[in-house]
C-alpha cells in the first residue's frame, strides 16, 4: 500500500524512540575476536538499560536479530533477556532480514505497540563475523546421523569406512546467495556495469564516507550513542570503531586491485564495507508511556516499508524500491527530508540507488509512478559517513543508522530523516523518522 498510513496506537500515540546505543564496531578477527554475537547483544542491551535508568521489569518485548546464527542458541533475543536482568516473563523472539534485520526488529516492536499488546520494547541486532558456525560436509553429516541410529560398533565402523578424507574437512559458512551462487560483491559489480558507475566515483564515495565518519568521531558527536566495550579477556577496552580511516586520502584507493571481477572489475576492498562485529539496540515505547515515565523521546517512527525484487541481477536496489513507499506512507516528498542515510554495502550499490532515485524511466517502468523521487541533495546524504567507514555487523546496521539519524536531527533542531538499506535476497527497507523541535 502506498497511501498515507499514520503509525499511531489505538489511543492516538506516536511510536517513540527513547534511546539508542551501540557497541563500537570492529573489523573481523580484531577487537571482538572470539566474542559471540550473543555476548555483544547482552553487552549493548545491558548498557542501554543502565543509561536510560528504566526498570528492566518494564520491558515487555525484545525483538533482536542475528544474520550469522549459531546453532547452539538460535533465539538470540531470549538469551539476551535471560542475561540482562529483565523479567523472565519478558517476551522475546528473533528475526532475520539479512542486512535489514534490525529494521525488521523495529517494525515488529512498533506493530506490537500499535496493536496495544505492549507499551515498551527493545529492538536491535548483533552479529559476529569472528565467531562463525563452522559446519561439516554433507557426507559426514549424514554419516553422523546414521551412526546415531546404529546399534553395534561394527555398524558404526562400516559407516565411518565409507567416508573419504575430504569429507572430514570443515565447511565455512557460505558467502554467496543460496539461490544464485552469487556473492554480494558479484552483484555490486553487476550494478557498476549496468548503471555506469566508474571506479573513480566508487573510490570518491568511500573516501567521503571515511572522511565524514572520522570528523564525526573527532568532533565527539558519536560519544553518547557508542558505549565503551569491555570484552574477554578484559585486557583492553574498545571505545571507537576500528575501521574508520582518520587519514583517508583519495590517492590510496586507486592502488587496490578489484576484489571480485579480477580482470574488468571496479569493486575493491576499499570501496566496500568490511566484515564486522558489533551490536546495536533501540528502546521504543508509546508516546504517552514515555511521558508517564518522565522520558524525553529522541524522535518518532513516521513510516516504514519493505521491498523485494529478483535476485539474478542488480538485486541490491532495495532503497530505490522501499524508499518511495516509505515516503508515500509518511505523506512526504524527498524535498521535505532533512537527512537521508543509506546503507553503504558497496559504493557501487549506493551510487546505483542514488541514480534510480532521480530516474523518471525507473519510476515509470518499475514503480508505476509518474515521476522520480528526485535528485538527492548530497548535503543531506550520509552526513556522518556510512557503513563503508563504520563497518557492517549485518543485524546491527539498521539500529545504528536509526540512532545516528535521530541524534543528528536533534542537533539540527528537528526534521524528517530517511534511513534505508539493501539486503541479500533482493530485499530492501526504508523508514521515515521524525524529530520535533
UniProtKB/Swiss-Prot annotation:
The keyword Repeat does not apply. It holds the Pfam family Thiolase_N. The active site is at 99 (acyl-thioester intermediate), 392 (proton acceptor), 422 (proton acceptor). Its EC number is 2.3.1.16. Keywords: Acyltransferase, Cytoplasm, Fatty acid metabolism, Lipid degradation, Lipid metabolism, Transferase. GO terms for biological process: fatty acid beta-oxidation. It comes from the Bacteria. One of its GO terms (cellular component) is cytosol. It is an enzyme of class 2 (transferase). InterPro entries: 3-ketoacyl-CoA_Thiolase, Ac-CoA_C-AcTrfase_FadI, Thiolase, Thiolase-like, Thiolase_acyl_enz_int_AS, Thiolase_AS, Thiolase_C, Thiolase_CS. The keyword Thylakoid does not apply. It is found in: Cytoplasm. It catalyses: an acyl-CoA + acetyl-CoA = a 3-oxoacyl-CoA + CoA. SUPFAM superfamilies: Thiolase-like (SSF53901). Pathway: Lipid metabolism; fatty acid beta-oxidation. GO terms for molecular function: acetyl-CoA C-acyltransferase activity. PANTHER family: ACETYL-COA ACYLTRANSFERASE FADA2 (3-KETOACYL-COA THIOLASE) (BETA-KETOTHIOLASE)-RELATED. Belongs to the thiolase-like superfamily. Thiolase family. Catalyzes the final step of fatty acid oxidation in which acetyl-CoA is released and the CoA ester of a fatty acid two carbons shorter is formed. Heterotetramer of two alpha chains (FadJ) and two beta chains (FadI). This is 3-ketoacyl-CoA thiolase. It comes from Pectobacterium atrosepticum (strain SCRI 1043 / ATCC BAA-672) (Erwinia carotovora subsp. atroseptica). The gene is fadI.
Amino acid at each position: 500500500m502506498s497511501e498515507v498510513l499514520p503509525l499511531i496506537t489505538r489511543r492516538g500515540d506516536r511510536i517513540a524512540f527513547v534511546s539508542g546505543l551501540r557497541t563500537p564496531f570492529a573489523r573481523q578477527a580484531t577487537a571482538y575476536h572470539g566474542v559471540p554475537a550473543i555476548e555483544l547483544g547482552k553487552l549493548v542491551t545491558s548498557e542501554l538499560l543502565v543509561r536510560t535508568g528504566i526498570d528492566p521489569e518494564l520491558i515487555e518485548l525484545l525483538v533482536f536479530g542475528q544474520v550469522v546464527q549459531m546453532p547452539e542458541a538460535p533465539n538470540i533475543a531470549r538469551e539476551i533477556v535471560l542475561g540482562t536482568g529483565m523479567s523472565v516473563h519478558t517476551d522475546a523472539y528473533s528475526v532475520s532480514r539479512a542486512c535489514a534485520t534490525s529494521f525488521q526488529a523495529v517494525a515488529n516492536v512498533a506493530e506490537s505497540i500499535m496493536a496495544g499488546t505492549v507499551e515498551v520494547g527493545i529492538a536491535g541486532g548483533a552479529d559476529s563475523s569472528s565467531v562463525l558456525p563452522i559446519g561439516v560436509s554433507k557426507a559426514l553429516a549424514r554419516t553422523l546421523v546414521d551412526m546415531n541410529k546404529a546399534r553395534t560398533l561394527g555398524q558404526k565402523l562400516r559407516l565411518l569406512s565409507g567416508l573419504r578424507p575430504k569429507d572430514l574437512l570443515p565447511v565455512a559458512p557460505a558467502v554467496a546467495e543460496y539461490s544464485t551462487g552469487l556473492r554480494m560483491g558479484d552483484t555490486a559489480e553487476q550494478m557498476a556495469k549496468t548503471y555506469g558507475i566508474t571506479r573513480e566515483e566508487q573510490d570518491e564515495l568511500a573516501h567521503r564516507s571515511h572522511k565524514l565518519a572520522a570528523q564525526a568521531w573527532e568532533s565527539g558527536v558519536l560519544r553518547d550513542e557508542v558505549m565503551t566495550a569491555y570484552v574477554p579477556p578484559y585486557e583492553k577496552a574498545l571505545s571507537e570503531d576500528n575501521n574508520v580511516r582518520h587519514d583517508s586520502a583519495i590517492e590510496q584507493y586507486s592502488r587496490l586491485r578489484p576484489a571480485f571481477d579480477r580482470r574488468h572489475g571496479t569493486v575493491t576492498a576499499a570501496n566496500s564495507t568490511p566484515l564486522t562485529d558489533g551490536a546495536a539496540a533501540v528502546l521504543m515505547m508509546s508516546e504517552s508511556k514515555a511521558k508517564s515515565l518522565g522520558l524525553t523521546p529522541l524522535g518518532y517512527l513516521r513510516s516504514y516499508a519493505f521491498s523485494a525484487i529478483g535476485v539474478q541481477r542488480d538485486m541490491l536496489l532495495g532503497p530505490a524500491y522501499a524508499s518511495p513507499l516509505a515516503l508515500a506512507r509518511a505523506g512526504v516528498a524527498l524535498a521535505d527530508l532533512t537527512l537521508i542515510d543509506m546503507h553503504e554495502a558497496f559504493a557501487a550499490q549506493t551510487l546505483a540507488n542514488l541514480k534510480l532515485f532521480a530516474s523518471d524511466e525507473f519510476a515509470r517502468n518499475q514503480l508505476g509512478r509518474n515521476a522520480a523521487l528526485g535528485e538527492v541533495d548530497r548535503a543531506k546524504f550520509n552526513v556522518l559517513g556510512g557503513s563503508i567507514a563504520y563497518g557492517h555487523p549485518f543485524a546491527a546496521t539498521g539500529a545504528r543508522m536509526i540512532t545516528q539519524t535521530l541524534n543528528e536531527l536533534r542537533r539540527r533542531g528537528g526534521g524528517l530523516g530517511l534511513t534505508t538499506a539493501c539486503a541479500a535476497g533482493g530485499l530492501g527497507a526504508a523508514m521515515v523518522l521524525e524529530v520535533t523541535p
